[in-house]
Amino acid sequence: MDWILICKALALGIVEGLTEFLPVSSTGHLIVAGSFLRFHPEQAKTFDVVIQFGAILAVCWEYRRRIVDVVTGLPAQREARRFTMNVVIATLPAIALALLFEKTIKSVLFAPVPVAVALVVGGAVILWVEGRQRERGKPSRVQSIDALTPLDALKVGLAQCFALIPGVSRSGSTIIGGMLFGLERRVATEFSFFLAIPVIFGATLYETAKDWHAFNVDSIGLFAIGLAAAFVSAFACVRWLLRYVASHDFTAFAWYRIVFGLFVLLVGYSGWIEWI
């Protein structure tokens, strides 16, 4: 296997793992990184599906005990059924809109200006929500995932719909949306992790079924390297983020989004990257 391709696979896997669960938009980062690394567009499209799968496996591993407890508790435990129902309720709106508007989103919004605007506006929204949190000066209404109501889950699910716009960030929309609707910062972050499981698994299955011909024996090694890199980096990132939100807000990520959005606009129109 070509060592240059191995390095590219490692780099893209790490980028995916580090950005998938932070409120910074993994899509924007992968587009820029993939173009700089000169990944072939079709190869990059398939590879993105694989490394996303690696990232979500990291969340499954981090929360494996909770997931097992929920699955085994479904027949008899009310808490397990309520948790599952909340995840389903929060997942359905985005899935419905994605199926309805997938082609429109890809044809209209995958361009430098929409992605850059989404990054910058998302950063501004984070600054506003964090400022609102400081002004309130009192504890958030929902202090535990188990205290989430179906209405809370629906609100977070509606917020997740904004993530269909490239550059918004699925994690950003669910975490910040959750905080806006009364979830404590860590609760919003953890619920965002759990929502990623059905969303990314579903997207992986859908894209794999649609482009199954792109998966061939020659690419298995490259995909395995990218998946492993995404898994390890995502696992480290998830653990770090849980520690970070215990004593920090998301203001730094907001400013990063704004700067990165301007960078995307610059490289998109300068010809430095090939926009997919």
From Swiss-Prot:
Gene Ontology, cellular component aspect: plasma membrane
GO biological process assignments: cell wall organization; peptidoglycan biosynthetic process; regulation of cell shape; response to antibiotic
Main location: membrane
UniProtKB keywords: Antibiotic resistance, Cell inner membrane, Cell membrane, Cell shape, Cell wall biogenesis/degradation, Hydrolase, Membrane, Peptidoglycan synthesis, Transmembrane, Transmembrane helix
GO molecular function: undecaprenyl-diphosphatase activity
Family annotation (InterPro entries): UppP
Transmembrane parts of this sequence: 85-105, 108-128, 187-207, 217-237, 253-273
Subcellular location: Cell inner membrane
EC number(s) recorded for this UniProt protein: 3.6.1.27
Broad enzyme group: hydrolase
Catalytic reaction annotation: di-trans,octa-cis-undecaprenyl diphosphate + H2O = di-trans,octa-cis-undecaprenyl phosphate + phosphate + H(+)
Membrane topology: Multi-pass membrane protein
A Pfam family assignment: BacA
Role summary: Catalyzes the dephosphorylation of undecaprenyl diphosphate (UPP). Confers resistance to bacitracin.
Similarity remark: Belongs to the UppP family.
Note: Bacitracin is thought to be involved in the inhibition of peptidoglycan synthesis by sequestering undecaprenyl diphosphate, thereby reducing the pool of lipid carrier available.
Protein's name in the database: Undecaprenyl-diphosphatase 1
UniProt organism field: Burkholderia thailandensis (strain ATCC 700388 / DSM 13276 / CCUG 48851 / CIP 106301 / E264)
Underlying gene: uppP1
